[in-house]
Amino acid sequence: MLLTLLFLATVTAQPAPAPQAKPAAPPPAKAADVETCLACHSDRTMAVTLPSGETRSLYVDLETFRSSVHGTKIGCTDCHQDMMTVPHEARPFKSLREFTVAYYEQCKRCHFDNYTKTLDSVHYQATARGDRMAPVCVDCHGAHDVKPPQKPKSQMSTTCAKCHEGVFTVYKKSVHGRFLEQTNDVPGCTDCHRSHDVAGPRNIAWQRRTPELCRTCHENKTLMDKYNLSTAVAQTYVADFHGMTASLHETDPNRTVSVVALCTDCHGVHDIAKVNEPGSRVLRANLVKTCAQCHPGVSDNFPGAWMSHYEPSWKKAPLVYGVQLFYNILIPFMIGGLVLQMLLHFWRVVVNR
Amino acid sequence: MTTYLIRFSLRQRVEHTLVMSFFLILSVTGLPQKYFDASWARWLINFMGGIDHIRQFHRFAGVSFTLLTAWHLMFAMGAVAAGRSPLSIVPNRQDFDDAIQMMRYYLGRTDQAAKFGRFDYRQKFEYWGLVLGAVVVISTGLILYFPILFTRFFPGELIPAAKVAHSNEGLMAFLVVILWHIYNAHLNPDVFPFDKTIFTGKISLERMHHEHPLELERIKQVRDIEET
C-alpha cells in the first residue's frame, strides 16, 4: 500500500510544475514522498558503517532540505531512484567517496546542459583519468542543502577555496579578492575560470582569451567610472606590440601556441594588485623586473618603451605625439601636392594635343 | 646613325631593380602590420603565413634594403670624392626656377616649358625623397629591431616614437610610389604604358630632345651625334 502510494506520488509529481507555488505550501505529492522516507530517516542515530571503516549518517534534516532550492520542487526518490523498495537493496559502496561519485549522474536528469558542460572541464578530465577526488556536482553544490550558487556571490569563490585554498589565499589579498565580500563588481573565481566547464590553467585556448576576459569588465564604462579606472586599457594594449601580436595569433588558423605578454603576464594573475600600490608588478620601480621576465638584461630605460596604456599626448609621450602630428600634416600635404602636380601635368598634355 | 643614348649604367639598373623588389616586399609585409586590425590585413597576414613569418620577411628585406642603400651611398660618395660624379642629381637654384616655370606652363601662364638637364626637378625630388625616406625607415627600423640595445643609451619613448615614424614614413613612401612614380613611369601620356629606360638603360634621342634637351646638348658638345 505504502509503495503504491509512493509510486503514484513520484509519477504524478513529474508534470505540472505549479507556477509560482508558494514555498510555504509544497505540492502534497512531494510531501508524501518526503514524509514516507522521513518516517525512517528522521532518526538522528541512523547510520551505516562502510567497509572502509567510515560511517555515513543516514539522517536527513527536513528543514535543511525544505530550505534548499529543491525543497519544494522535487522529492527524495527523484534523486534516490534506486531506493524505491523497502527495505532498500544492499549497496556495494566501499567508501564514502565511492558513494558520492556513484550519485554524480543523478543531477543530469534535470540539469543536462550543465552536466554536459562539466564534461569539458578540467575537473572531468581528472575524473576521467580515474581521480576519485576530482569534484562532482554535489562537492560544490551540496546534496540535500543545495543553495542558489550566487547568493551571495562570494559563495562561489569560497566553494572553490574548499580545495584550492592556496590560490584563494593569494586571491583574497589581490585588488579583486579584497573586495569580494563587499561588492559584486569584482570578479570571483568562476568569472574568469568559468564554472561547469572550468578550464585548466594550462589550457592554451583559454589562456589566449585572457585579454578578452579582462575586457569584459575593464571596457565596461559604467563599472570602470565607479572606480575611476580607464576603459582604454584593452585598446591601448592592442595598439602596441604585445597586444597586436596576441590579437593576430588569435585569428591565425595555423597557430596553437602564442608566446606574447598578455594582461596577466605583467599584472599578475591571482595576486593582481592596484597599479599604484607598493607590491604592484607594474609600478615603475618594479617594471624592469616585470619586463625582464621575457626580456632578460634590459636597462632601466626599457620599460619606457611601453606607454603604460596611455594614448600619446603632449603630456604623456610628447615625442610620440609630436612625430604622429608631424606625419598627420606632412602626408596629406605631400600627397595632395603630388596629386595636384599630376593633374596639372595631365591636363596640360591633353590640352597640348 | 644613333637613335638612342645610354642613360643608365648596368649598376644603376640593377640597383633600381633591387630597390623596387625590396620596396614591394617591404610594403606588402609592412602595411598589413600598420593596419593589422583591418580585415584585408588579417587575410593577407594569414595568407603569408602569420605575423611571425611576416616580421621575419620584413626584417630580412629591411636588412637587404639597408645594405643596398649603404652600397649606393658609399659608391656615390666615392664617385664624388674621386671627382667622377657630374653631381647632376644635386638640386640647385635652377630646379626651383624650373618648378615655378612648369607651374606657370601648366596653368597656361606661359607657352614655354622649362628645359631640363640630365634630371628634372621631379626626378631629383623623387630621388632625394627616397634617400631621405630610406634614412628615416632604416634608422627607425633598426631601433625597432634592437629596442633593448637602443634603450641602453636613449629613453624608452624612442621606441614607440620610432614605430610611429617608421610606419608613417613607410605609408608615405608607398603612397608616393603608387601615385607619383606610377604616374610618371606608366600613366604619363608621354611614356604610356611603360617607361622602359630604367630597365634597358636606353633612351631614344627623340625623348631626350623632348625631356632632357640640355643634357642632349651637353652630350653633343663632347660626342658626335647624328640625329635622324
Language-model regions, residue ranges each:
Chain A
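Short sequence/structural segments immediately N-terminal
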Residues: 10-353
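Bacterial N-terminal signal peptides
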Residues: 1-10
